[in-house]
Curated annotation (Swiss-Prot):
The lineage of its organism: Archaea, Methanobacteriati, Methanobacteriota, Stenosarchaea group, Halobacteria. Binds to the 50S ribosomal subunit and prevents its association with the 30S ribosomal subunit to form the 70S initiation complex. One of its GO terms (molecular function) is ribosome binding. Pfam families: eIF-6. This is Translation initiation factor 6. Keywords: Initiation factor, Protein biosynthesis. The gene is eif6. Belongs to the eIF-6 family.
Length: 226
């Protein structure tokens, strides 16, 4: 576990995104933070913009099969990511294309913004090679901000309803539970960068919140199994 911030903001999930084999970070991150995050997540880091923006966590997501980014990405940015990642980078089509905000995914499935077009859903299915379902989470359409997923669990907005949790469990094939980050903030996807072996959380996150995060996302299980 690593507590961190970007330019004083504890919403680390807005500015960084971890897939199975690469950590994407905003381009102006300091070297110490980049190195610490890469070490915690045990994956190489790429400091970059996406579409000229530093909000790379909001604009990108991925799993073991591929990475999805906003269609505003430049060729130079795509090449920078693909140089380090072992998978291809695909642009999410349509007007709702902040991939990190609108897609919640792991290696088993994806749960996405309810208004994504059929073309966008098909693009996600192809890029990530998983089944896709549309839905909301606690009335939040940007489901990637309202939850964070690993291959062991999904931590969701504290006002998520039971049918929503069940839908996420069905489509991502892991247990889902509720929690908060950064001393009570409900948009947990904006405050956590979750990898398969470790995670980075906003610096304002409390001890009880950390316990819920580690239990729900499977880090306690991982430690026990070791």
């Amino acid at each position: 576990m690593l507590r961190a911030s970007f330019a004083g903001s504890p919403y680390v999930g807005v500015f960084a995104r971890a897939t199975d084999d690469v950590l994407l970070l905003r381009s102006d991150v300091d070297d110490d933070t980049a190195d610490a995050m890469a070490a915690e997540l045990d994956i190489p880091a790429v400091a970059t913009t996406i579409g000229g923006s530093g909000t790379v966590g909001a604009l990108a997501t991925g799993n073991e099969n591929g990475i999805l980014v906003t269609s505003n990405v430049t060729m130079r940015e795509k090449e920078a990511i693909e140089t380090t990642a072992s998978v291809s980078v695909t642009e999410l089509p349509g007007r709702i294309n902040a991939a990190g905000n609108v897609i919640l995914a792991n290696d088993y499935g994806a749960y996405v913004h309810p208004d994504l077009s059929t073309e966008a859903v098909e693009s996600i299915e192809s890029a990530l090679n998983v089944p896709v379902a549309r839905g909301k989470l606690a009335d939040v359409r940007t489901v990637g901000t309202a939850a964070v997923a690993t291959n062991r669990g999904v931590l969701c907005h504290p006002k998520a309803r039971e049918p929503e949790l069940e839908a996420i469990e069905d489509h991502l094939d892991v247990r889902a539970d509720i929690g908060t980050v950064n001393y009570g903030a409900p948009l947990v996807g904006s405050g956590i960068v979750a990898g398969q072996t470790g995670y980075v959380v906003g610096e304002d996150t409390t001890g009880p919140e950390l316990t819920r995060i580690e239990d729900t996302l499977g880090y306690l299980e991982s430690i026990t199994s070791e």
